[in-house]
């Protein structure tokens, strides 16, 4: 834990703080200023201390610093900031006035008077640090609350469609209980209702996982898993939607893939989310690919590609943040948290996830998983 600069000496000492990004950056300037101060006339000494901004960011806010290096006369009050190329020259210009302020402070202390009873610099800086930390905490809480509000609003909107579709299917089945529906239509309605219920379940699962927060750890129960079967199950679940948009779908999943060491339920979520996004953003008649490759002896790589609108290069990293929702998403169902959840799951398996995309040419999402035999004990 970093300690605040020592600012507890008498007010008659001229206390100088040299702000810089780090100590190493201003080592030469610090030595130059110390030698320069020793050559200045005056009764009252100066104490110079280097303050690295990376250790005390709240001090930069307290003194309203806009550039570094900067020299701050912290005591006697009032504080004064010097900035620019030639701090030694500025110090020499202000030195007589600072000597006068130190003399006045010493006289008032000697007379038993507290000059205007101002808070000590130590107290001011401690309060500044507390205010800085409180502002940070408030900003983080506000961001979390805003995100939860957006999620709730989108959840209400997105659940309405599958709920309505399920209700219509159930009502139709209920009306046809007396035999007015043929078996093929009944089976189609049951399948449609089941598909919509799974869709709602997936939405709610994503919401619950996201609500745990980025800092929480996922509970991973890794076991030996065959990826071909897992991929096939997800494809079958999404197949009605693929057919409904007349999408061309291709899969290249070698039968001799090694087993992977994963939590099958969590990896199913990743596959479902990536394929669901590909279906969502690929226009009718477009194409989607699912490729699984034994990349190295240690990893298997999974790739989901589409011919959708693509993702701007500037957004290709931020899309994995739980608070980002691209402009292309505004007319689509979703929460802007699916990819964030995918990243958390993949990283929890010690894998990587990334995207390659060009505007107007589609996107390819890749992620890696550990091969099972390397995890045996």
Swiss-Prot record:
E.C. code: 2.7.13.3
Example of a GO biological process term: circadian rhythm
Species the sequence originates in: Synechococcus sp. (strain JA-2-3B'a(2-13)) (Cyanobacteria bacterium Yellowstone B-Prime)
Histidine kinase domain segment(s): 154-373
The keyword rRNA-binding belongs to this UniProt entry's keyword annotation: no
Catalytic activity: ATP + protein L-histidine = ADP + protein N-phospho-L-histidine
Record-linked CDD domains: HisKA (cd00082)
Catalytic class of the enzyme: transferase
Function of the protein: Member of the two-component regulatory system SasA/RpaA involved in genome-wide circadian gene expression. One of several clock output pathways. Participates in the Kai clock protein complex, the main circadian regulator in cyanobacteria, via its interaction with KaiC. KaiC enhances the autophosphorylation activity of SasA, which then transfers its phosphate group to RpaA to activate it. In addition to its output function, recruits fold-shifted KaiB (KaiB(fs)) to KaiC to cooperatively form the KaiB(6):KaiC(6) complex (independent of SasA kinase activity).
Protein name (record): Adaptive-response sensory kinase SasA
GO molecular function: ATP binding; phosphorelay sensor kinase activity
Oligomer status and interactors: Homooligomerizes. Interacts with KaiC. Participates in the KaiABC clock complex, whose core is composed of a KaiC homohexamer, 6 KaiB and up to 6 KaiA dimers. SasA and KaiB(fs) compete to bind to KaiC.
Phosphohistidine: residues carrying this PTM: 157
Alphabetical UniProt keywords: ATP-binding, Biological rhythms, Kinase, Nucleotide-binding, Phosphoprotein, Transferase, Two-component regulatory system
Domain notes: The N-terminus interacts with KaiC, while the C-terminal histidine kinase domain autophosphorylates and is probably responsible for self-oligomerization. The N-terminal domain stimulates the C-terminus to autophosphorylate.
